[in-house]
Every structure is written in structure tokens, then in C-alpha cells.
């Protein structure tokens, strides 16, 4: 008679889930026009959570009152406490803060956009922010745009559009309208989107930023076949 002792442990659970959450719907709808709602509900295909939301999630135009952002089950609720500006594109950039509840797979570069007017501004200003002294990337720095081209705007007015640099110093300011801008970097200690403390680290670019749409034509490859007549 043969016998063996049973091993105590968890049953095999199959392969590890490496699929990030998938966005499946929202209220208001993504890309909604003439939106007046300050509360946004986002729905995903699985249970999710937010990681370091206060560091990673950026609302543009910037909000003086910190938005309320909560994850529950398969939903994320965003409550914008500032009044909405008319005829303005709003972008809630989550970066990689949204992850699935079990394995922590991130939904990378996810952003939600709506407009309080009749159109969505779709241009982006992207780049990399480096420390001038050693050319190392700067993480977590606010990068913002001013359409007011006076130098005094930087320390008198809040940014109009913003983004935050990642661990490689990269940033992408979304929802930018056509026009001319000055761009600045700011380690915003008091979170008022304005340079008003001498201790705050700053960065700037000498040239104006003029985003524009470019038409690109893609040429497909054609194969030329020679057919001989009989």
C-alpha cells in the first residue's frame, strides 16, 4: 500500500495577470462638449485603485482647490471644486496612477478630456526637463504655459495649462489651444501654480512656444510586378 502526505499550500492560480485595466465608459462622456458638470465618473473593466494620486494626477487648467479623486470598485470619482471656465478644454491626466487591484498593472498615460465649449483643443506641448548643472532629469516638477507673454505673468498669474515631469524628466501638456506661449518649470512648494517663493526651483525656455498642427502624408509601399505576355 502506497500513501503520501498532502502538502499544505495554495492551489496553482494559473498565469499572472499582466493586463492593465481598460477604460469602458464615463459620465460625462469622454470628449464631451458644452459640459457643465464638475463631477466626473470613470468606469473600468476590473477593480482598480489609485497609486500616489496626489503626486501623479494633474488637472489642466490647474485647480486652486485640490480636486477630490477617489477609487471605489471599478470606478473613479473626480470632483472638481473650482468653478469651470467657459469655452475651455479640461484634461485630467492620470499618468500611470490607475492600476488593477490585484497585480498592480498600470494603465499608462491615461487622460480624460472634456470641454465647456463647442470644441476640444487637441494639441500637446511635450519635452524633457533636465537639471542645467548636471543634465540629470528632474522628477515631479510642474511645467506650465502662459499665453500672457510678459515676464511678470510667471509670478503674478497661475499657469493656464500644466503637466508634471516623470522619473525621466518627461512631460506632456495636453489640451493646448493654438497661440503663442511661454513655458516654465516650477517646483511649486505652496501649490498655487505661481512663482512667489525664492526657495522654489524654476526653469524656463528663452524661445516662445507656438504649437501647430502638421499635415503628414504616409506613403504605402507598392510592389511592381512585371507580367510577361505569352
Residue ranges with predicted function:
Residues 205-214:
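Short, composition-biased linear "edge" segments at structural boundaries
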Residues 222-230:
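Residue-level detector of conserved catalytic or cofactor/ligand-binding positions
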Residues 5-168, 172-175, 180-186, 198-204:
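Acidic, low-complexity Ser/Thr/Gly/Pro-rich repeat segments typical of extracellular/periplasmic
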Residues 192:
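Acidic carboxylate motifs that coordinate Ca2+ or other divalent cations, activating on Asp/Glu
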Residues 6, 216-223:
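Intrinsic N-terminal pre-sequences and regulatory tails
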